[in-house]
Each structure stands twice: as C-alpha cells, then as structure tokens.
C-alpha cells in the first residue's frame, strides 16, 4: 500500500469512527432533548416504570385531592390522554386546576407518575405547544385559548371616552 492509500484509509476510518460516535451520542440524547413529555406522548412511548422524565400539561379540573402531610394527587391532561400524578411537598403558589404544569419524576408500576418536583407557570393562559397542537388535532381547540383574560374579542374596539364598540354601544 502506498503512502497516499494508507493516509486515505486512516482518514476514512477516523471519519467512520466519528460518525458512529456522533450517532451513539444523538441516540442517547434523543429523549433528553425534549423539555417535557405530554400524557399522550407517555402513553404512545410506553415509558418504563422508574425512568425519570418531565411531564407537562394542564391540571385536570376536579382532579386535585389533598391528603395528609402535604400529599397531593391530581391528573395532568393534554386534551387526549390523562396521567395521574402523586406529589408530596409544597405546591407552588400559582398551582391550580386548569393551570399549566411541569412535573419531574418517574412512573411507578401502577402507572402513577410520582413527582418529586412540580412547577406551575405564572401566566394563567399558559399552554404548552404540544398540548395546543393536540387540542387542535382533536378539534377541541378554542380561539380564546392562550389569550390573557379580559383580552378584547376580534372586532371589538376599546372603550375609551366615547368610542364605540363593534356592536355600536357608546359609553
């Protein structure tokens, strides 16, 4: 083998090893890149019990139950699937039903997500992008989702000194 052939073989081998290493790293990070998984994603992936991940969605109205010693259970939903969550600790001040939440923990053998951290978004109109996409796909999306409370409806005009609304009323 000539020097040129040997050099090309070494360069080709190095590139192959680099490509394999990059593929292994990307494969290992594939699940870690997502900030959180929605209940639908968890159901589709069949996440193994004990595997840590972040769960995001909306706290299902009527599902919040408080127990002894700061124990709380609630359901996180994304419009498609619901996942029961158990947490023991102090909840954020802004945590409430219908609110966006991200919980970190793992599934137990019975399918309950055991959270050790719960975060609530400060904006009551917060909705994770994945949840909004799921709601749109399933036809449950309402146009006023994601707008601050009290926001003007399309076609309305502000009510400053004598201005008219779209309906024609004056102040």
From Swiss-Prot:
<keyword id="KW-0472">Membrane</keyword>
<dbReference type="GO" id="GO:0020037">
    <property type="term" value="F:heme binding"/>
</dbReference>
<keyword id="KW-0201">Cytochrome c-type biogenesis</keyword>
<feature type="binding site" description="axial binding residue">
    <location>
        <position position="126"/>
    </location>
    <ligand>
        <name>heme</name>
    </ligand>
</feature>
<keyword id="KW-0735">Signal-anchor</keyword>
<protein>
    <recommendedName>
        <fullName>Cytochrome c-type biogenesis protein CcmE</fullName>
    </recommendedName>
</protein>
<feature type="binding site" description="covalent">
    <location>
        <position position="122"/>
    </location>
    <ligand>
        <name>heme</name>
    </ligand>
</feature>
<feature type="topological domain" description="Periplasmic">
    <location>
        <begin position="29"/>
        <end position="171"/>
    </location>
</feature>
<keyword id="KW-0408">Iron</keyword>
<comment type="function">
    <text>Heme chaperone required for the biogenesis of c-type cytochromes. Transiently binds heme delivered by CcmC and transfers the heme to apo-cytochromes in a process facilitated by CcmF and CcmH.</text>
</comment>
<feature type="region of interest" description="Disordered">
    <location>
        <begin position="137"/>
        <end position="171"/>
    </location>
</feature>
<dbReference type="Pfam" id="PF03100">
    <property type="entry name" value="CcmE"/>
</dbReference>
<dbReference type="InterPro" id="IPR004329">
    <property type="entry name" value="CcmE"/>
</dbReference>
<dbReference type="InterPro" id="IPR036127">
    <property type="entry name" value="CcmE-like_sf"/>
</dbReference>
<keyword id="KW-1133">Transmembrane helix</keyword>
<feature type="compositionally biased region" description="Basic and acidic residues">
    <location>
        <begin position="137"/>
        <end position="146"/>
    </location>
</feature>
<keyword id="KW-0479">Metal-binding</keyword>
<keyword id="KW-1003">Cell membrane</keyword>
<keyword id="KW-0349">Heme</keyword>
<dbReference type="GO" id="GO:0005886">
    <property type="term" value="C:plasma membrane"/>
</dbReference>
<keyword id="KW-0997">Cell inner membrane</keyword>
<keyword id="KW-0812">Transmembrane</keyword>
<dbReference type="InterPro" id="IPR012340">
    <property type="entry name" value="NA-bd_OB-fold"/>
</dbReference>
<feature type="transmembrane region" description="Helical; Signal-anchor for type II membrane protein">
    <location>
        <begin position="8"/>
        <end position="28"/>
    </location>
</feature>
<dbReference type="GO" id="GO:0046872">
    <property type="term" value="F:metal ion binding"/>
</dbReference>
<feature type="topological domain" description="Cytoplasmic">
    <location>
        <begin position="1"/>
        <end position="7"/>
    </location>
</feature>
<dbReference type="GO" id="GO:0017004">
    <property type="term" value="P:cytochrome complex assembly"/>
</dbReference>
<comment type="similarity">
    <text>Belongs to the CcmE/CycJ family.</text>
</comment>
């Amino acid at each position: 083998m000539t020097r040129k052939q040997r050099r090309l073989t070494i360069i080709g081998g190095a590139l192959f090893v680099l490509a394999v290493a990059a593929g292994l790293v990307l494969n290992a990070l594939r699940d870690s890149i997502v900030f959180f998984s929605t209940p639908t994603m968890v159901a589709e992936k069949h996440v193994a019990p004990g595997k840590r991940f972040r769960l995001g969605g909306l706290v299902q109205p009527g599902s919040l139950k408080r127990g002894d010693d700061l124990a709380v259970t609630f359901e996180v939903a994304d419009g498609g699937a619901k996942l029961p969550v158990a947490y023991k600790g102090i909840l954020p001040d802004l945590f409430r039903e219908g609110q966006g939440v991200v919980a970190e923990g793992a599934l137990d053998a019975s399918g309950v997500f055991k959270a050790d951290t719960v975060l609530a978004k400060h904006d009551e109109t917060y909705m994770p992008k994945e949840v909004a996409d799921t709601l749109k796909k399933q036809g449950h999306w309402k146009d006023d989702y994601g707008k601050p409370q009290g926001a003007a409806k399309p076609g309305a005009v502000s009510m400053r000194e004598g201005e008219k609304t779209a309906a024609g009323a004056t102040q």
